[in-house]
Amino acid sequence: MDKTTEVIYNEALLKFKTISERLVEIANLMQRGEIIVAKEELDRLYIESVHTETKKCGSRLARMMEHILKLAYCDDYNEILRNGRIWKNDAIKQREEVRNLVQWKNKHQETNIINNINDLLSETYERAIRYYNIAMKDNHSLALYEERIPLICIWKLEDLLDKEIIDLVEMLPNQTGYYPKYVKEQLDAREKKLNAAKVLGTSSDDI
């Protein structure tokens, strides 16, 4: 188990222990016939859980949006070649975490958490811009077009959780066009490899 996984594991274990202790206390209240107090404690525990999950989702969405802004407003195509895939993959990773946390479009979707995230989306976007500005201090290719970044979030939560990264980039005004160019070149290169494989009788899995 690496250090990052160990930290996550320990945090989850502590959270599980805390919730278990609270549930035992609530069960004891019910056994003593203090039903109203038990219900109040259970409601409080649920509200705390929703708040915690909302905060966690907000942090992940902010990171996701930060990476999309980088893809849209980086002024150096060579930087896109170096880091474009990294930024895109991390944006996807953050999104998948959020989708899993809220059970996005599943039968037992976490409606309360989703509503909270929607209410805080503007604040989350502002945090993404702050993250971008911090990254800009170490990566000067993010500085030139920083003023093009919209001050108001143009995405809806549904956009962020459902659309492809390239589509989210292209929704932004005055983006450099470097990332769409990069994606097109990658798709063209992949198609050439697939066509070459067909000619040579090679499986595409071998590419």
Where do the model's predicted regions map?
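Surface/interface-facing alpha-helical segments and adjacent flexible terminal/loop regions used
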Residues: 1-59, 69-207
